[in-house]
Amino acid sequence: MKAKVVINLVKINKKIIPDKIYVYRLFNDPEEELQKEGYSIYRLAYENVGIVIDPENLIIATTKELEYEGEFIPEGEISFSELRNDYQSKLVLRLLKENGIGEYELSKLLRKFRKPKTFGDYKVIPSVEMSVIKHDEDFYLVIHIIHQIQSMKTLWELVNKDPKELEEFLMTHKENLMLKDIASPLKTVYKPCFEEYTKKPKLDHNQEIVKYWYNYHIERYWNTPEAKLEFYRKFGQVDLKQPAILAKFASKIKKNKNYKIYLLPQLVVPTYNAEQLESDVAKEILEYTKLMPEERKELLENILAEVDSDIIDKSLSEIEVEKIAQELENKIRVRDDKGNSVPISQLNVQKSQLLLWTNYSRKYPVILPYEVPEKFRKIREIPMFIILDSGLLADIQNFATNEFRELVKSMYYSLAKKYNSLAKKARSTNEIGLPFLDFRGKEKVITEDLNSDKGIIEVVEQVSSFMKGKELGLAFIAARNKLSSEKFEEIKRRLFNLNVISQVVNEDTLKNKRDKYDRNRLDLFVRHNLLFQVLSKLGVKYYVLDYRFNYDYIIGIDVAPMKRSEGYIGGSAVMFDSQGYIRKIVPIKIGEQRGESVDMNEFFKEMVDKFKEFNIKLDNKKILLLRDGRITNNEEEGLKYISEMFDIEVVTMDVIKNHPVRAFANMKMYFNLGGAIYLIPHKLKQAKGTPIPIKLAKKRIIKNGKVEKQSITRQDVLDIFILTRLNYGSISADMRLPAPVHYAHKFANAIRNEWKIKEEFLAEGFLYFV
């Protein structure tokens, strides 16, 4: 079904587009230039109208004469239409900025209607990100509202003006750290650079460089007597104890990621994602930053009404979308109490009702797990731990202890005993069943401060003493809201290093998600969701798709190059079969690599060999291969290599989750824009928020070492949509990403975070890392 939806794009007047473009070759490397003295490459970009500098140091300009002191040579004159589409869009974006329509100007307009807000030590600043998309020969400005979370203190203040503390801070936060230059009106965000092998930050203690970049800001941005006084009031005199930090642009969209610049700790503040903050602060900030579609739309309309220019339209654009058919919603198969595989619709229940029968309700049919891992069947006893955060109130601790015990009883009585008795009746046709899991009265209750390193170490020591000689343990953890996601991650990782799979339940859930009929229990669906998640982590799967893909296998990959004690890890691969059943999860171990890059020929060859170890041959098969992000040229070469070596037909496309396009409607749909497909596979159930589409682009068929580019078809879109139904982390919610991509990314993150790799668990689909 078709519909019209407003999106965050406005049409650009074609009068801005030049007839002629001039191309120049730049001889000196911008990076070398920066090391010598400074910023001529930046001055070139700022002081000449209409400049785009490509990764190969070609200058694309609207002007015939450049004011530039470096070495370059004119290469020719071309028409605008001869430029590649991406360079056309970059140049139009630059011309908009030079006509007074830039991120800085639009962000100022936005803040008339949505003020910055302070949350403790953090300030949340509404801002605008801009990009340009070419669609049907017209250009559109994408206006995306974001919220930047930044420290109230400068980086230099945060580290107590101590160079050693600065280095430690940068090392500790190197994965996610972004720094904003607050002494520039552009407020550009940068990412610090680190040494290739030592991973230490690239710091320069040369006082001349520090003075140069301090004075650069004054001369460029604060060059009137009044402005200089304001600069000194805000930032003080230059502190020559601080080192300069070599950094690169954080945005890969607007600027060449290889360009470097020096930052002064005195003039920058760290910026954050909400996930990096303590959860109580993060929750407040996330609540503030969530905007309903109508709220976003209204803010953009207010901005456009303030723009005094005819270069862009004053109204947001509409686009035609295709709604996802309702019959695709519940495409799953389950096993009934006789062990037969049936569509869930035949049992007249929904996915969210898979476990309702465990409350001894005759209203709901018994549903057996679709498959139980052999490894899990053989375990006779699993130690059970209840871990309580001492920061919780006593009544919450007592409630959590009792609730976790009841959940365990549900697993033991309803799942283990009843499944086994039912399974015995069904053994003639199916080998189904859970082991007898004897938790009764044997759980260990541990209470410690989970917000402290000492408390976490104490938990690990106590669990370790109980896990001697045991293959697998299970822990339910009650944690306060104040714990950051990093602390959650550390606790779960340390427990799994002892073979203990854990399930965290936070304070909000324990306090606010009570059953309305029995305040001594959690809400019924919350209980079943927790059971579903725990059993998924233990490898127990309750359903497959009632749908067949036109592929032998679907594989999600993620690249995570790093040195581990057991060898060099290149990343992860997660395999699903043609009916959406998760078959194998494997780490890709490869030979020693140089730097952060991975030899993708070796990566994909190892992937094929790894699956072969489990008697899954990819030779002569057709596979759909997906990853989170763009398939790089290096990865494409690797796929050409295995397609020829093993006679594999590979279909792949980019699956991009981070982009600025938003559609102001909360429904499952897809639309074509600028040669890409934007798919919204989920509908938000929460009170606030705007659905974020995933972008599907650049479909390739790789066969016999050759690449054929094709358009993404409606069937491709439906395949991706169906793959988002395979969520083992929630009994009812939909996923934003297709399942193979989601789980490959989760496992790659676990590898990066030093989780123990248990290949015997992974081989049977244990999702312990989720």
UniProtKB/Swiss-Prot annotation:
Residues 154-272 form the PAZ domain. Inhibited at greater than 500 mM NaCl. Its EC number is 3.1.24.-. Keywords: DNA-binding, Endonuclease, Hydrolase, Manganese, Metal-binding, Nuclease. Its cofactor is Mn(2+). Probably binds 2 Mn(2+) per subunit; only 1 is seen in the structure. Mn(2+) is the preferred cation for cleavage, Co(2+) can be used but not Mg(2+), Ca(2+), Cu(2+), Fe(2+) or Ni(2+). The keyword Nuclease applies. Optimum temperature is 87-99.9 degrees Celsius, has very low activity at 37 degrees Celsius after 16 hours. Can be used to create artificial restriction enzymes using denatured tDNA with appropriate guide DNAs. Multiple gDNAs can be used in a single reaction. This is particularly useful when cloning a region without any known restriction enzyme sites. Can be used to detect nucleic acids at the attomolar range (10(-18)). Residues 362-544 are annotated as: Mid domain. GO terms for biological process: clearance of foreign intracellular DNA. Mn(2+) 2 binds at D558. The active site is at D558, E596, D628, H745. CDD domains: PAZ, Piwi-like. Gene3D superfamilies: 3.40.50.2300, 3.90.70.180, Ribonuclease H-like superfamily/Ribonuclease H. Residues 1-151 are annotated as: N-terminal domain. One of its GO terms (molecular function) is DNA endonuclease activity. Residues 473-756 form the Piwi domain. Monomer. A DNA-guided ssDNA endonuclease that may play a role in defense against invading mobile genetic elements. Uses short 5'-phospho-ssDNA sequences as guides (gDNA) to bind complementary target strands, resulting in cleavage of the target DNA (tDNA). Endonucleolytically cleaves DNA in short dsDNA (the gDNA indicates where to cleave on the tDNA). Efficient guide-dependent target DNA cleavage requires a minimal gDNA length of 15 nucleotides (nt) and works up to at least 31 nt. Overexpression decreases plasmid transformation efficiency. Has no appreciable activity with gRNA or on target RNA. Belongs to the argonaute family. Long pAgo subfamily. This is Protein argonaute. The gene is ago.
